């Protein structure tokens, strides 16, 4: 499992190299979403997916999701949304 804020978009050539040896859970999950992963404290442009979970050696990924929950005392708890992947080994 390789996860993190890569600060590059999915079409970046470096990620294309990683795609040769690992799988993006956002792409392979049976259930997924299309939310941004970077919110920039509400100032980010659309189409900002720069956080990833890559895997190899798992039999499936039933679910990937971006947690975009809002809180009553603050809209954002970080400038990035958490991402979650459920994996079956």
Pin down the residues of each PLM region:
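Metal-dependent phosphoester-hydrolase catalytic domains
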Residues: 6-89
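Residue-level marker for buried hydrophobic side chains located in beta-strands
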Residues: 1-2
